[in-house]
């Protein structure tokens, strides 16, 4: 028996990440990597704006219920993303300005918050 209960949210997340990547690329950012996973956290997108590295969390909600995508990021998730980014910076020996952005997608609305946290 195949368990599909997590398949639909994962597909929505991947679709949201693709939308976010295209949205940011249209605004001049350069794609580096997606879905970087470590045991202690995950980075949805890594992009660059000139020499600046951008670690991006993507939140997708098909409906704006419960505060929508803009309010879907918890302090614990921020901590995990920061740890993952610090690890990525260390193993890739990055010595550059970095920032953390949030892309929040509610149905068809895309909100980009540079330096979100």
UniProtKB/Swiss-Prot annotation:
One GO MF term attached to the UniProt entry: nucleic acid binding
Residue pairs linked by disulfide bridges in the UniProt entry: none
Matches recorded under InterPro entries: Restrct_endonuc-II-like, tRNA_endonuc-like_dom_sf, UPF0102_YraN-like
Superkingdom to which the source organism belongs: Bacteria
Pfam families membership: UPF0102
Family: Belongs to the UPF0102 family.
Family annotation (PANTHER family): UPF0102 PROTEIN YRAN
Name of the protein this chain belongs to: UPF0102 protein Swoo_0351
């Amino acid at each position: 028996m195949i368990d599909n209960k997590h398949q639909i949210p994962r597909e929505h997340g991947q679709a949201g990440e693709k939308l976010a990547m295209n949205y940011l690329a249209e605004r001049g950012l350069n794609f580096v990597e997606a879905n970087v996973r470590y045991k202690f956290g995950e980075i949805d997108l890594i992009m660059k704006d000139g020499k600046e590295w951008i670690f991006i969390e993507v939140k997708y909600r098909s409906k704006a219920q419960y505060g929508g995508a803009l309010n879907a990021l918890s302090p614990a998730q921020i901590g995990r993303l920061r740890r993952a980014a610090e690890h990525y910076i260390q193993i890739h020996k990055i010595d550059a300005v970095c920032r953390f952005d949030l892309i929040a997608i509610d149905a068809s609305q895309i909100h980009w918050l540079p330096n979100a946290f």
